[in-house]
Amino acid sequence: MSGMQTGPHAQPALATTVVADLDALFSVDGIKIPGPDARVVLVLDGHHTIKYHRLGLPAKPPASGKPVLRFEGGEHIAIGDNTLLRFSADSAPIEAWKVALHLPNGLTLSYGQIAALGGDFYGIPERPIADGATAQERVERFAAAFDSLAVLPASRDEAGRILAVMQREIAAANQAIKDGRQPHEAYDQLGDSLSEEWNKITGGGSFVSPMFPLGRYLKLAASNWDHFGEWALLAYIAGHTGALHQAMKARASGDVGQLELAYAMNAFADHFLTDLFSAGHVRVPRKAIKDNVTPADLGSLISRFMHDEDSKYGLVLRNAQGDTWRGYGDKRYFDTIDVANRKQIAEAVQKSADEVFQAFNTGTLPTPDSYGALRVAADLQAVVEDQVPGNFAPLFAMRNGKLMRRADVSNLNDQAQIDNWWGWSTYLLLKNYTPNKPSGYLEAPAAAPSIHADGWQTQVPSPPNWLPGHAVRYAVSMVNGLNESYIGPWSDYAELNDRFQPTLTVPVDNSGKSTSRHLFRQFRGGSPELIAALAAGTTTYIDHHQ
């Protein structure tokens, strides 16, 4: 548990601190320095990212990196709280959101809340889990990270304040869903506001900037390779191993409270597991960029551009079970295009939790190479080595021990790579770039489905949805294999008074780029749901779905 800072950090002397935008370095006037002892703090305003943390880049020493995006807290809560937990072989499983997990310091949290807090808000910034030299050391590092949430007394109040801010994120995403908008648009509107508050809650911020100095939240983000690729895999294995051993202790003691602790540890570990499904975390060589680009801050900074590309356009993923699907990245978990990825994540997290109970119930431990969740997770090597057809060219990649860059950074389809590139010049190319869309990208349709005025199938209501006083509307997306567009506009809501189950006219793709369409339905006040896959030539659909 050493290395955890819980109170306000000692503030640096700010009288000779100059805070300026990074781009001012490249302007005609430059940055005016008041004296030889002045400290320059460079900050960055968003150019392309949906949301990223605003972090100072000190002129010297370049010790910490630019935080890179991750699944948002609300997404982790939803993933974790939909999991089923068992406490007895004779009892039915319980939805995780109904289960209060009691931690040693008195905190009571749900599985999803712990998954949201793990790694992003709690951990030891200077001791990334995956940096442990051995499997045992990684388990020990995970335990220290978990204890920073579960054992430290100060976390009782702090975690509640973090979650209170996170609730605003959740409310914004929920409202977007009800409005029929894509939730990532809500995250876009929030900007950096929540990150500023989280930085202050975790000991950072000052009158100069809410993001300077760094609190634990931003320090963790600056060394967050535990959330990327092979490092996320190592972090999950360490945490899941620790949780399984805790389940064995619970079995030996017969204490259900000890099983709660095992589930809590596993929820913390599942944060890293779910990162293995976030496209912007799968193939970004996060640690290699940090280690090879000088200063390290700059390497962390340019990592985010690749993260954002992969998150926005998604990657084709495959796993050991033979599944192939397209997954998108942070802030897109609830978007209509990420349905297939949500199913894979849910399966992996459920397998992870089930193994904790199996260890408790049977007294046997699986070996790390047989962990069930890892058969569901993306095959990292296949994606990194471009063995999966359908993915656009990576911005950065390790090839034969060299850190390569896409030759034309603005062309997502440029497979040419170069090794003679520099961090600062690459940043200048990226900071205002407008990359083209990848091959196979499908534009959202311009028209909405329409309801036939005389096409209603019945006047008999049927619960839970086809009831008087309800209203329904429809939208469609274009599909070609694993490529799918965002949905087009929604039809107007049709009031359901004495008519139910309509007949629809569904727009077709006149461009010929799609081979099928997905039809979505939304009842007023509810969430959009995928109800049908339609062949390219089908123009009529009768909605008999409940």
Regions found by a protein language model. Give the residues of each.
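Short intrinsically disordered, low-complexity coil segments enriched in acidic
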Residues: M1-G3, P445
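N-terminal, motif-rich segments that launch catalysis or mediate targeting to/interaction with membranes
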Residues: G3-A264, V282-S439
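Active-site alpha-helical segments that house and flank conserved acidic catalytic motifs
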Residues: A262-S278
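Short loop/turn segments at secondary-structure transitions that flank enzyme active sites
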Residues: L276-V282, L482, G525
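Disordered, low-complexity "stalk" and linker segments at domain junctions of extracellular
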Residues: G440-Q546
